């Protein structure tokens, strides 16, 4: 008798929770960068947020085009988690530095959006980490060989 496995229907990245969090993260970072540009904030604020926008766009394109499935020689979820944590640290620093002097309203707005971006990046990293931990097809999958056999 044939043991046919049902095909798992692929859910597009844009409709997944991970996709929604990445899109929200991109929107918040672009908004923060726009506020910093309009307010003529110090250049490091604009450069850091601009760099984060390009990195987030890279990861979104990577997942939308499913290039992570083609390039298996890199462990993309680990890179994504590291990126989320580094982005969290940088955006926290930018937001604190933008909020302390309270120079203009737009700079404060950019700082607030950078702070919300940092929280969103932390949530993104936690979401990816949770998916890695509970991935049933990962290397730590429990196999029937490891189960105890009952002796009667």
Curated annotation (Swiss-Prot):
BP-aspect Gene Ontology terms: lymphocyte chemotaxis; macrophage chemotaxis; neutrophil chemotaxis; secretion by cell
Activity control summary: Partly inhibited by interleukin 10.
A cellular-component GO term for this protein: extracellular space
Zinc found in the keyword field: no
Transmembrane portions of the chain: 45-65, 81-101, 108-128
Molecular-function GO term, any one: chemokine activity
UniProt keywords, alphabetically: Chemotaxis, Cytokine, Membrane, Secreted, Transmembrane, Transmembrane helix
Domain MARVEL intervals: 13-133
Organism domain of life: Eukaryota
Tissue: Isoform 1, isoform 2, isoform 3 and isoform 4 have highest expression levels in adult spleen, lung, testis, ovary, peripheral blood leukocyte, placenta, pancreas, and in fetal brain, skeletal muscle, thymus and heart. Lower expression levels in adult skeletal muscle, liver, thymus colon, prostate and fetal spleen and liver.
Annotated family: Belongs to the chemokine-like factor family.
Function as written in the Swiss-Prot or TrEMBL entry: May play an important role in inflammation and regeneration of skeletal muscle. Essential for embryonic development.
Protein name per Swiss-Prot or TrEMBL: Chemokine-like factor
Organism: Homo sapiens
Recorded name of the encoding gene: CKLF
């Amino acid at each position: 008798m044939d043991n046919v496995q049902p095909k798992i229907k692929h859910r597009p990245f844009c409709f997944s929770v991970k996709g929604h969090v990445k899109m929200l993260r991109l929107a918040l970072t672009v908004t923060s960068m726009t506020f910093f540009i309009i307010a003529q904030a110090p250049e490091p604020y604009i450069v850091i947020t601009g760099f984060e926008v390009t990195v987030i766009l890279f990861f979104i394109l990577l997942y939308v085009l499913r290039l992570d499935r083609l390039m298996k020689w890199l462990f993309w979820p680990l890179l994504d988690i590291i990126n989320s944590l580094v982005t969290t640290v940088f955006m926290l620093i930018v937001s604190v530095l933008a909020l302390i002097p309270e120079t203009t309203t737009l700079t404060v707005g950019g700082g607030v959006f950078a702070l919300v971006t940092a929280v969103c990046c932390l949530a993104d990293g936690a979401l990816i980490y949770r998916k890695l931990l509970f991935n049933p097809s990962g290397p730590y999958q429990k196999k029937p060989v490891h189960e105890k056999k009952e002796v009667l």
